[in-house]
Amino acid sequence: MSAAGTIKKLGVIGDVHAEHHRLEAALAFLQTMETDAIVCTGDIVDGIGCPNESIKLLDNAAIFTVRGNHDRWILEDKARHIENAHNVTELSEESLSYLTSLPTQVTLNTIRGKLLLCHGVADDDLRKVWPGTDRMGIERSHLLDKIILEGEFQYLINGHMHFRTLIHFEALTLINAGTLRGEHWPGFSVIDFEAENITAFEFRDNQIKRVKTHDLVQEAHTIWADTQSFCGGWDPVTLF
């Protein structure tokens, strides 16, 4: 799926997990930031809040949203044993229609090049990408390597890992959107493509707080050729 228009400023919302109150607050805040568009990495269901309200908010605001693995699972009646899982019977007809119609990928045009929005990597909603740290081993992706090699996209925004970070490749910047869920750095971000930076916001004590701003491209960051060049010992560029 492709979307027309050239984006200068983009709102970025990660995995929702039915946090409809935080989603509503994030959308209202992003409206004040005068973003050209807002994206969401999916996983709308399975959480402590209301999936129908979450879906309605995304739909009414015309947010570019992709399907996450939890959205797929509820439609396939899989993994319903997980904590705070929803049942398909809890979804309205409108919500079912919305989830069924979600794409796995969305292409957007920015003033700095093309951007791919997905949940994991492209159509693989379970794929993780991680250069390797003391707490988590290396996660490589031949599919992402193919995307990098083809050179069509300059940016990729994904979710799934619930860990807002930047991973820099020579020809592409990967931005993990994080999540609205839980108490470990729940939040969202704003990318300013004119200024070439990203600003992170968090929910703290029921308020939205600005956390930090990072340059999208910076020589001090570790820059990889592709995921096969991951070698561990990475110092993550965090957005929290």
Segments the model singles out, each with a brief description of its role:
Residues A62, K114, A195-N197:
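Structural motif
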Residues K8-H17, K114-D123, T173-G178:
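Active-site-proximal beta-strand elements of phosphoester/diester hydrolases
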Residues E24-A25, P51-E53, A79, V129-W130, ...:
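Short amphipathic alpha-helical segments
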